[in-house]
Amino acid sequence: MKKLLTTLFALLMTTAGTQAQVSFGHAEKINKGWSFLRVDSAWNVSERPAMKEKAFDDTRWRKVDLPHDWGVELPMSPDKGSCQGYLPGGVAWYRLHIPVGKLTEGRRHYIYFEGVYNYSEVYLNGHLLGKRPSGFASFLYDMTPYLEKDDNVVAVRVNHAQEFDSRWYTGSGIYRNVWLVSAPEVHLAQWGTAYRLTAINKSKATVEVDVETSGEGRVKSEELKIKNEKLSATVELIDKDGKVVATAKTTIGSSEKKTVKLTVKNPQRWTLERPYLYMLRTVLNAAKAEDNDTSVVRAGLRTLDFSPNKGFALNGEWMKVKGVCVHDDAGVLGVAVPKEVWRRRLAELKDIGVNAIRLSHNPHAPELYDLCDEMGLLVMDEASDEWEFPKRKWMKGWNAGKPEFQGTYTYFEEWIDRDVADMVRRDRCHPCVFLWSIGNEVDYPNDPYSHPVLNGDGTGFTQPAYGGYKPEQPNAERIGIIAQRLAKIVKDIDPSRPTTGALAGVVMSNATAYPSAVDVVGYNYTESRYGIDHKTYPERIIYGSENRHDLPAWKAVTDNEHIFGQFLWTGIDYLGESGQWPARGSSAGLLDLAGWRKPLGWYRAALLSTKPVCYIGTYRNVSRPGRNGNNRRNQRPNINAPGRWNWEKGDSVNVVCITNGKDARLLLNGKEVGGKPGHDESTGALMWSVAYEPGTLRCETDNGAAYELTTTGKPYALKVTTDSVAHVFVEVVDEGGNTVTTADNEVTLMVRGARLLGMEHGNIADATITGRQQRNRLRTHGGRLVAYIQPEEGTTMFTVRASSPFLEGGTLTINR
């Protein structure tokens, strides 16, 4: 019996994960077999109004599967904006033919898009279903009024002609999943199920569950009215063994919201170490069983407490939030990122010691929230980066040259209320979400808002003033007014979590209603205000919403009980916000674009991890002119030093040790060298200067950690490995099997039984990596690369063969 219940629970978990954010009816992905055409005058491909019509001939269009980001299929160009990673946008159409067999007579049919960038227009058989300018919003359209008895055609126009509308790479296209949903005439509302933990102890928990139905305006016949009178809803909470641990029932109308109460005995809490997930199943019971509707969502029971003096507590335990910010992309994949790629990235961040993710600066793909629920990571969900005025979008490098001012501000007033509400309704069932952010750096001084306080008060402050108060600029008081409006929208939907905002101009915002409009106030790069503002505003809850990687920024958290945490900029390198050409993105992450840990990631692990940590990197010790013309050696350790032990014999080499131990010793070919290491107070790193000899360099710390570097020979062969069906790793190795970290050999991949989505090496400065013609060929960086693989449907095995001139190739066969 227990096995049967466990199987049932696994099925429910799969259903919840598969259907993602579709919380009613029967949902089916329709990602396969779309026709795609990018319309571009430069390519002599013109747009025609008939492209939305059912009868339009799209047989010559390219076939693509979703999710799809056309931006990374095209070459980078210095003529494009550095803000978007020198990648193009444009206008494109997608079309999908839905056979009549996929539709069920007598039911309503919907189409649900998790995300389309941007300015989407969706048509069914030539009829406009709706428009959504936001490229980050998820949205649902009712197809029923325009369905025909034969095949039906969905056409989607995507307009990213304003290519410079974001400060980072957004991608272009239908870059998230699309779902076809079938439901009875009266059904549970999309995102209509929500729960709140109202009380919990070891023996009992009380959970309130909202149930909402949709059917208003459709219940017209007497038969349907009779059905409506007999509607009821049953709510069940199911544990991991498949056992129903709490249940409640209520009558409900065809377009009504009801709240029921569940009592759970011996509740299991959702924690970061043990993220226990129940299943919350809601059944809308109609007069006939075939008219029933079901919603299944995951549920985690946890408490959140915030204090201006003690910080933040999860489940009553006060803790520090060790967060990072992340953007949507994954390098060569653009923003069409498979779930397993995110799983690997999040697992690496968690291994470093990260316990929270700030989803910058927009709602992300639903699968990412599912992973954070499963893996035990807190999430700060963020609505937008821009309000009623545009920010600077840099064209020739970060903060360089003349900016553009395209942006999402063009539809702010019309859509922001809906976009914020939809974010909260969509994501409120995720236990990982602990903060709702209404905006990022909307208060940057004179970009565009200004205030007399920018003239200074004689005491000085750290925020850039850009020439002081500019009365011709928009009045900063507007920020507080908008913040009050957006915070109210959030709290009306979900009073169980606090609102926040990430403030860039704290001093200026303190002169407005913005900080008081939100429950928790985020400070971007303003550690110097932590103590001052804690005294000035003793009821304010403060944390670092965006921070540098340096040790003083982290000590500002650990040394101040009232500061509950920080979010590093960033957790992972990302496309866009690039430096000068040919940089395709920002290298501010703990992980590179390929998802590999950088030395900076090891440095953060030494600060955050509870496990023993040791890493060594090396660089040549060169003389540099000091003050008064004297020469001096490199005294401050470079914490970004690469892990390599290939130098010239006799070179003086600096060896940097990053560790959470207090002391370490260095061994070269088994003999201790370097003596007692120097300790750098500014970074906490240890360092030796030693004479280079080939062989094995090993560091051992006093807390039991160790790290080795080995001198490698010439490139000899390719080593091909995998950690899952999503990733295949290719390394250039010498005859001893050691990775040659200096190798940049070109690798060609041949894949059978699967689709090669792309190859990534993590090199932020490589402008040749984009473009479809480059998809199966790439030079290694640091002697390695990762290939992203998507198995074909129905296949149980696929093969990857790697080759490179003058090297022995490698072949890997993977069984699913």
Where are these regions (language model features)?
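Beta-strand-rich binding/interaction modules
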Residues: 124, 204-217, 227-251, 258-260, ...
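Short flexible loop/turn segments that cap and initiate beta-strands
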Residues: 56, 227-234, 273-278, 652, ...
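Bacterial Sec-dependent N-terminal signal peptides
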Residues: 1-23
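Extended acidic/polar, glycine-enriched regions
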Residues: 148-149, 210-220, 225-308, 691-694, ...
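Accessory beta-strand-rich segments of carbohydrate-active enzymes
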Residues: 28, 35-39, 84, 89-191, ...
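Short, hydrophobic beta-strand segments
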Residues: 143, 260-269, 686-692, 774-793
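Substrate-binding clefts and catalytic carboxylate motifs of secreted carbohydrate-active enzymes
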Residues: 26-46, 55-56, 65-66, 163, ...
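Active-site-adjacent substrate/metal-binding segments within catalytic domains
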Residues: 67-100, 104-125, 130-133, 140, ...
